[in-house]
Amino acid sequence: MKYDVNELKHQLYSGILCDVMDGMGYRNQAISNKINPLNDETVIFGPAFTSIGTEVYSMPEDPLTAQCKVVDQLGEGEIYVLVTRGNYNCAVFGELFATAVKARKGAGVLLDGYARDLKALKEMDFPVFFRGKNPKTSKGRCEINECQIPVTMDGVAIRPGDYIF
């Protein structure tokens, strides 16, 4: 049986999904309340496109090339999942990459790090879940160059293609 993702997005809610997953024996499938949406009404639903950020200590010649190459691989309807491995010294997501994800028709972003340009993200009505805010750019601080590999966010294992809600 096929389901319309957009229809399910409006019919389901996180509590019932957690109850069902618990009943199936998957008891650690919810991200904690440390990661929140920009707007409380925001719902994202779609397959995960995973990536990992690594802390760096020097400014590369072309600092955004690696992340641009990763985002360019994002497919329509996918959720851009970015794990920072506890690197909270900068924002790893903002208006520039929101524009890129939106252009690729990504369904939203889930990151365990910081975001910036929040006013612009709100004006774009861009669905993003994040840990907090930080005005500092990721250039020379964090590089995203690994993608479509299994990741762990907030203790929850996420594989490429896993559905995020």
Which residues are covered by each model-predicted region?
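Feature captures the catalytic cores and cofactor-binding loops of soluble hydro-lyases/lyases
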Residues: 1-160
